[in-house]
Regions:
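Signature of N-terminal electron-transfer/Fe-S-associated modules in redox systems
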Residues: 1-230
């Protein structure tokens, strides 16, 4: 059964044609080489499934049927087993994703600190709702749950990089800068936000050396830790 695609109003999934097309020979060879490195990290092959799914997204931009088939083959799993995992976690996208995934935290603290207002403003500004993508293919917008950064609420994530203490205006500027092609630096971590596919490769375990370019744990977090130790 095919599980990947856009859901229609009737509840059916429409699957992009390229989702089922075989990989080009050179692309598949590169995938298999990267997969071998991932699998070698684990005592059991099936344990490599999560990073393997990120690898699929680094190649295709979302979880494709061909990616599912290749993961199943390489890990000695059924396609149903792979599909079950890929449909459980929200980081795995079942239809083409934008270059940047912008997630607005609307969990309790972020919501009361302004997350709901940010969501309404940026959703209206972009003309899209949850898990929808702008017509230019650049921004996919999401409501997200807590990212363990409550001391910087409200928080917006872009390809899983932190943008702390956001406002409706700052978030609208963020998405406008991304769409105009400007380099955008998150509050913490790397010196700029990379694309969804580039970040997916990092999440597959192929580090790009950017994580420590900026501050990691910020002052408020460290102050809280010090109080907890007293």
């Amino acid at each position: 059964m095919e599980h990947y695609g856009l859901q229609t109003a009737a509840g059916h999934l429409t699957v992009p044609a390229e989702s089922k097309e075989p990989y080009a020979a050179d692309v598949e060879a590169g995938f298999r080489a990267d997969a071998a490195q991932i699998i070698a990290r684990y005592p059991q092959k099936r344990s490599a499934l999560l990073p393997m799914l990120h690898l699929v997204q680094s190649v295709d931009g979302y979880i494709t049927g061909r990616g599912i088939d290749l993961c199943a083959e390489l890990l000695d799993l059924s396609t149903a087993e792979v599909s079950g995992v890929a449909t459980f976690y929200t980081q795995y996208k079942r239809h083409p994703n934008g270059r940047y995934t912008v997630g607005v935290c609307t969990n309790t603290l972020c919501a009361v600190m302004g997350g709901d207002a940010i969501w309404e403003a940026v959703s209206e500004h972009l003309g899209i709702g949850h898990d929808e993508t702008t017509d230019d293919g650049l921004i996919t917008l999401e409501r997200i749950e807590c990212n363990a950064a409550c001391d910087f609420a409200p928080v917006v994530m872009t390809n899983w990089e932190f943008f702390d203490n956001q406002t409706p205006d700052s978030t609208i500027k963020l998405v406008d800068d991304l769409r105009s092609g400007q380099d955008v630096r998150p509050t913490r971590g790397p010196d700029k936000v990379v694309s969804f596919q580039e970040m997916s490769r990092v999440l597959a375990g192929f580090l790009d050396g950017r994580a420590d370019q900026g501050p990691g744990a910020a002052g408020a977090s460290l102050a809280g830790l010090a109080v907890a130790h007293e």
